């Protein structure tokens, strides 16, 4: 069986890890980075770029460069957070036929799982290049506060990328695994505060020794799936736009290229202000008007940035309070605070967390890599390579059904340890009612309409009976991925109806299979393109080497030889400009054949010259060896 890799599919950056010989290793990508930007770009010549290469060209191609797509995964177009996102990003967010939020690139509508799959494919390839073997299985992390639709959509993204997702686990839980694996035996309670690029989670986790097993039990979790580093960037961008407007009277918000440059500059400034007190944002030629080009130059202090984002940091404290309350634990009982996510490097975040929990956060956990490392550990547990770890996670939100009067009746309360199964008996609301609709909901509100609708299905052919008489048993079953299976059974007839919740939207099986086929076709195209590029490079190198050889050969090459070689080289150069790999390879062979007589002649002459070398010169290396041996003997005395 192949390795199960661990992937942190992040809003801003992604990371892949593997467990080898009992140690967890973060795998570097082809560019040498330990994390990969979760950015996908579609270029004008039909190429799909992922990661650093996509980020580099974003300024010149903002409408077709997609970032922070994780914030759209499993979401409806009408949701407030999506409407807010539409105003913030340069690419186009559209309403899919099923009501989901999709993106449109070059006139083509694409589902967020399809785009996230491109990042997962890059992670998969990174692992395969390192391991030297195909990778088909993965553990993928999601924010703890992701709802059912978002978890399902993440699993779909894995399938489209050609991965069998063995488990979806929560990011804070994964970070706790990475932190707790090498800690001394004994019980302790930790807080994982995870403020990433697009989402915020906090989990209270108890790490205990139970019968020799390392047990990680999530006691409670809370969060906000639309709060993260991207929001901090937006505050800074808005400030820079306002400052520029005050100075020049020009609004940069209508200029996608200027806004993309601002986004990059704001992100860079934010990072710099974590280690310095002041920085300059200097963007020459940001725009122009009739009077000429305009430049943006704004000084920003750390204090100014903190004043812009203070309320965002404050927003993270309330979920911490709720999580502690739900866990039934006093803040004084917390042994360690672990910070995860790049945004936690901000001094203000660290200060507020320390104030609330009454202790400094640990500095020995890498906020960018801990989540992927935890996923790799979970992968090793599932593969049977790690035996003494037990992970007990929870369902982050209450699950229930809509009952008479538009009320949500809970079946599984939030923070219930998963996997879990709960049943409850309901009945009909009217006499002789022949069918009931089971409307599945997720959320904490009493009114059904205020919660997230996960799906609905009908149980039909109920025998006629007075209202309240039929007994309909509804069963909720949450698997270890946090994905819900619901069934309804008429106890009188034994008739049963069940569904795996796929949300009332989501991707259909046909759509996923089509996307898998498209991805496989693209992979074949990518392979062909790579082979063509390799052949072109070989051809270029041969042209250069052969021309160099001809120059060195001088009169040693006859005019006929030179003419034959030049003809073959011209034909190879022409083939390199084309797209036919076989033609390039044929012309490479022709150049090699044409240049062989000259190369052999030169080799023979070099060999003769070598034989005629004076003996004294050949003795020198021997002298050196004797000296070295002599010194070594002296050292050993």
From Swiss-Prot:
One of its GO terms (molecular function) is unfolded protein binding. Induction: By stress conditions e.g. heat shock. Transmembrane segments: none annotated. PROSITE patterns: HSP70_1 (PS00297), HSP70_2 (PS00329), HSP70_3 (PS01036). The keyword ATP-binding applies. Residues 605-625 are annotated as: Disordered. InterPro entries: ATPase_NBD (IPR043129), Chaperone_DnaK (IPR012725), Heat_shock_70_CS (IPR018181), HSP70_C_sf (IPR029048), HSP70_peptide-bd_sf (IPR029047), Hsp_70_fam (IPR013126). The modification Phosphothreonine is found at residue 199. Residues 605-619 have a biased composition (Low complexity). Keywords: ATP-binding, Chaperone, Nucleotide-binding, Phosphoprotein, Stress response. The keyword Chaperone applies. Acts as a chaperone. NCBIfam families: PRK00290.1, PRK05183.1, prok_dnaK. Belongs to the heat shock protein 70 family. This is Chaperone protein DnaK. The gene is dnaK.
């Amino acid at each position: 069986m192949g390795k199960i890799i661990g992937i942190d599919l992040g809003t801003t950056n992604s990371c892949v890890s593997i467990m080898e010989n009992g140690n967890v290793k973060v795998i570097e990508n082809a560019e040498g980075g330990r994390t990969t930007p979760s950015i996908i770009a579609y270029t004008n010549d039909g190429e799909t770029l992922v990661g650093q290469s996509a980020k580099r060209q974003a300024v010149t191609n903002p409408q077709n460069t997609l970032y922070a797509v994780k914030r759209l995964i499993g979401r409806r177009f009408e949701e407030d957070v999506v409407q807010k996102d539409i105003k913030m990003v340069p690419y186009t967010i559209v309403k899919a036929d099923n009501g989901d939020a999709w993106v449109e690139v070059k006139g083509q509508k694409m589902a967020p799982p399809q785009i996230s799959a491109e990042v997962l494919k890059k992670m998969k390839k990174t692992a395969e290049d390192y391991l030297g073997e195909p990778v088909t299985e993965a553990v993928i992390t999601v924010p703890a506060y992701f709802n059912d639709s978002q978890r399902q959509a993440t699993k779909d993204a894995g399938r489209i990328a050609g991965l069998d997702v063995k488990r979806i686990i929560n990011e804070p839980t994964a970070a706790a695994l990475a932190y707790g694996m090498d800690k001394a035996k004994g019980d302790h309670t930790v807080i994982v505060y995870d403020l990433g690029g697009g989402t915020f989670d906090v989990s209270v986790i108890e790490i205990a020794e139970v019968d020799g097993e390392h047990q990680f039990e999530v006691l409670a979790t809370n969060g906000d799936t639309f709060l993260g580093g991207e929001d901090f960037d937006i505050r800074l961008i808005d400030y820079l736009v306002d400052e520029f407007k005050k100075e020049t009277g020009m609004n940069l918000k209508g200029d996608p290229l200027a806004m993309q440059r601002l986004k990059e500059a704001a992100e860079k400034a934010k990072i710099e202000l974590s280690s310095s007190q002041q920085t300059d944002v200097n963007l020459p030629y940001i725009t122009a008007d009739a009077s000429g080009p305009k430049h943006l130059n704004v000084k920003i202090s750390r204090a100014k940035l903190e004043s812009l984002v203070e309320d965002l940091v404050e927003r993270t404290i309330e979920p911490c309070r709720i999580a502690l309350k739900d866990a039934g634990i006093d803040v004084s009982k917390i042994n360690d605070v672990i910070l995860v996510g790049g945004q936690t490097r901000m001094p203000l975040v660290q200060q507020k967390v320390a104030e609330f929990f009454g202790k400094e956060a640990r500095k020995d956990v890498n906020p960018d890599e801990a989540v992927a490392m935890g996923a790799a550990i979970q992968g090793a547990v599932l593969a049977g390579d790690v035996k003494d770890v037990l992970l007990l996670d929870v369902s982050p939100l209450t699950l229930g059904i809509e009952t008479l009067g538009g009320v949500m009746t809970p079946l599984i309360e939030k923070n219930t340890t998963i996997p879990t199964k709960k049943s409850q008996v309901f009945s009909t609301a009217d006499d002789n009612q022949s069918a009931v609709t089971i409307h599945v909901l997720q959320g904490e509100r009493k009114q059904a309409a205020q919660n997230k609708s996960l799906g609905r299905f009908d149980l039909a052919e109920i025998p006629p009976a007075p209202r309240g008489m039929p007994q309909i048993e509804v069963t909720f079953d949450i698997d270890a991925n946090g994905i819900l299976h619901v069934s309804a059974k008429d106890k009188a007839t034994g008739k049963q109806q069940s569904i795996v919740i796929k949300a009332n939207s989501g991707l259909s099986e046909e759509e996923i299979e089509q996307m898998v086929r498209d991805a496989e076709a693209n992979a074949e195209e990518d392979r062909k393109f790579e082979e063509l590029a390799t052949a072109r490079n070989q051809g270029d190198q041969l042209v250069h080497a052969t021309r160099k050889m001809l120059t060195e050969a001088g009169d040693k090459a006859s005019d006929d030889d030179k003419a034959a070689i030049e003809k073959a080289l011209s034909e190879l150069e022409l083939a390199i400009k084309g797209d036919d790999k076989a033609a390039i390879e044929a012309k490479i062979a022709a150049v090699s054949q044409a240049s062989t007589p000259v190369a052999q002649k030169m080799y023979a002459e070099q060999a003769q010259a070598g034989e005629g070398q004076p003996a004294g010169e050949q003795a020198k290396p021997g002298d050196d060896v004797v000296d070295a041996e002599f010194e070594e003997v002296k050292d050993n005395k």
